[in-house]
Curated annotation (Swiss-Prot):
It comes from Mycobacterium bovis (strain ATCC BAA-935 / AF2122/97). It is found in: Cell membrane. It is a multi-pass membrane protein. GO terms for cellular component: plasma membrane. This is Uncharacterized protein Mb0906.
C-alpha cells in the first residue's frame, strides 16, 4: 500500500513558500496596522484580533493538507513576526 508517510517531504520548496508567505503577510499586517494606529491604537489591536480569530479556524483545517500546510506555517510566522515588529515600533516611539 502507498501510505502518505512514504512520500518525501519537499522541505526546500515548502520552506521557500512559507518564507514568501510570511514576508508578504508580515508586510501587509504591519502596514495596515500602522495606518490603524494613527486613527486609534485600540482599533488596530481590535481589528488584528478579529482578523486572526476569523482566519484561525480555516488555517487550522489546512494544516494537514500537504501543500497548504506551508501556507499555514508562513501565515503563522508572518503574523507573529508582524506583531513583534509592531510591538517594537510602538515601544520604541515611547
Amino acid at each position: 500500500m502507498n501510505d502518505q508517510r512514504d512520500q518525501a517531504v519537499p522541505w526546500a520548496t515548502g520552506l521557500a513558500v512559507a518564507g514568501f508567505v510570511a514576508a508578504v503577510i508580515a508586510v501587509a499586517v504591519v502596514v495596515l496596522s500602522l495606518g490603524l494606529i494613527r486613527v486609534h491604537p485600540l482599533l488596530a489591536v481590535g481589528l488584528n484580533i478579529v482578523a486572526v480569530s476569523g482566519l484561525a479556524p480555516t488555517l487550522w483545517g489546512w494544516r494537514r493538507t500537504p501543500v497548504l500546510r506551508w501556507f499555514v506555517l508562513g501565515a503563522a510566522v508572518g503574523v507573529a513576526g508582524a506583531w513583534l515588529a509592531l510591538l517594537a515600533l510602538t515601544l520604541g516611539d515611547g
